[in-house]
Swiss-Prot record:
Active site: 120 (proton donor), 214 (nucleophile)
Chief location bin: secreted
Organism per entry: Naganishia albida (Cryptococcus albidus)
Subcellular location: Secreted
Name of the protein this chain belongs to: Endo-1,4-beta-xylanase
Classification via SUPFAM superfamilies: (Trans)glycosidases
Job description of the protein: Requires at least three xylose residues for catalytic activity. Does not have activity against xylobiose.
Entry keywords, A to Z: Carbohydrate metabolism, Disulfide bond, Glycosidase, Hydrolase, Polysaccharide degradation, Secreted, Signal, Xylan degradation
Cellular component GO terms, alphabetical: extracellular region
Positions of disulphide bridges: 128-160, 247-253
UniProt-listed GO biological process terms: xylan catabolic process
Domain GH10: 26-316
Record field: catalytic activity: Endohydrolysis of (1->4)-beta-D-xylosidic linkages in xylans
Length: 332
């Protein structure tokens, strides 16, 4: 029989754990999300970052009430070689979620035949399809909507589509849930789709939840991982407001998960580095020309201090369903 930890490692889900938490900070992101009618405001984490008493953990526990393992529940980590399982990182993240009463989102399994097997093992689990480039109305999102409709018509246990793009922490018994599709939502500043609500409706109109599962907004940066200029910084703020507002405007969007929350822990600088694109030489020497890399995508800076992106997410949550799609400035 599979252990509960094994189930969490192989099933894509939201788990509600049994813990009574301390009184909430009424300006924290999770409190404001709950007050706005959302189930959670979450983030991705990696187990080595869970150092007791660290700035990272203090922010995690004070601002977020849902956790997604960034890598620890992926197949190649859980079962690095066939038949050999390692739940070390998974167990550490599960323990953190239990300690704080946070929701735990399993990330991820393969689909679609696994939906039925997962449902048989854990019938209370909500199961989601999580994909990228479906945050706008395009050929892929429309095709995914047809896939979802086909699965539902066949009786598949599909509950949500994730786009990878109550005012207190929970205190009830263990509840493992899904029925949705995930919108990943990895955006580039200034290029965030304006039709996210319409894309969400492709799935929510079928009764599927539409969580925003991996939100970040990368922008061009200088050598210090700071915004390259004021224009891109402003675009990034607008894009965070637009994204969070899209979730707030859809009753079947249960919440938003930021893909990590502090720039030093983001995956983006390691992938979208600046590159040498030209070399021009004269008798006096050579000029190297680099393209700008991307980074500064999250809510906290390298010193774990909140940035303008944090405050705009906070403001969008305060504005709630009346936020609209355009940010008009932070209300002090």
């Amino acid at each position: 029989m599979l252990s509960s930890t094994t189930l969490l490692a192989i099933l894509s889900a939201l788990a509600l754990t049994s813990v009574q938490a301390a009184p909430a900070d009424k300006n924290s992101l999770d409190y404001l999300a709950n007050k706005a009618g959302k189930r959670y405001l979450g983030t991705a984490v990696q187990s080595p970052q869970l150092v007791p008493g660290s700035q990272y953990v203090q922010i995690l526990e004070s601002q977020f009430d849902a956790i997604t393992p960034e890598n620890e529940m992926k197949w190649e980590v859980v079962e690095p070689t066939e038949g050999n399982f390692d739940f070390t990182g998974t167990d550490k993240i599960v323990a953190e979620a239990k300690k704080t009463g946070s929701l735990l989102r399993g990330h991820n399994i393969c689909w679609d035949s696994q939906l039925r097997y997962a449902h048989e093992v854990a019938p209370k689990m909500k199961l989601c399809i999580n994909d990228y480039n479906i945050e706008t109305v395009n050929a892929k999102s429309q095709a995914m909507a047809k896939v979802a409709a086909g699965l539902l018509a066949k009786g598949a246990p599909l509950h949500c589509i994730g786009m990878f793009k109550n005012a207190k922490r929970r205190s009830s018994g263990l509840l493992i849930r899904t029925a949705s599709s995930g919108l990943e939502s990895h955006f580039i500043g200034g290029s965030t789709p304006k039709d996210i609500p319409a894309a969400m409706n492709l799935f929510s109109d079928q009764g599927l939840e539409v969580p925003m599962t991996e939100l970040d907004v990368r922008i061009p940066v200088n050598g210090n991982d700071m915004p390259a200029n004021a224009t891109v910084a402003k675009e990034q703020v607008d894009d965070y407001y637009t994204s969070v507002s899209a979730c707030l405007g859809n009753d079947l969007c249960p919440g938003v998960s930021i893909w990590q929350f502090a720039d030093p822990t983001s995956w983006i600088p390691g992938v979208f580095k600046g590159k040498l694109i030209a070399v021009s030489c004269t008798f006096s020497g050579c000029l190297l020309q680099y393209c700008v890399g991307y980074g500064a995508a999250l809510l906290y800076d390298a010193q774990y201090q909140p940035k303008s992106t944090y405050y705009v997410v906070q403001q969008a949550l305060k504005d709630g369903k009346n936020s609209g799609s355009k940010f008009h400035g932070i209300k002090l």
